[in-house]
Amino acid sequence: MQCRAGCGACCIAPSISSPLPGMPAGKPAGVRCLHLDENHLCGLFGRPERPAVCGQFGADPEICGDSREQALALIAEWEVITAA
């Protein structure tokens, strides 16, 4: 599966424990990454300072669903399940 252009759910819904430029403590779940632009594209994509965890994430129908809204909901659900 290819990422949907303009989605950005993986840059909003999950927590990221790794430090990011401008977010040294990482990113809490449900908080928009500082590097997500107005078109929901990653400003760090392809740059060496992009966290490895972001580069390792791959689009998957079970996580991304059929729409941006579904992806946000599914990733938020995974956050709850994996936080327990």
From Swiss-Prot:
Name of one Pfam family that matches: CxxCxxCC
Listed InterPro entries: Puta_zinc/iron-chelating_dom, UPF0153_domain
Sequence similarity: Belongs to the UPF0153 family.
Entry protein name: UPF0153 protein PA1578.1
Organism: Pseudomonas aeruginosa (strain ATCC 15692 / DSM 22644 / CIP 104116 / JCM 14847 / LMG 12228 / 1C / PRS 101 / PAO1)
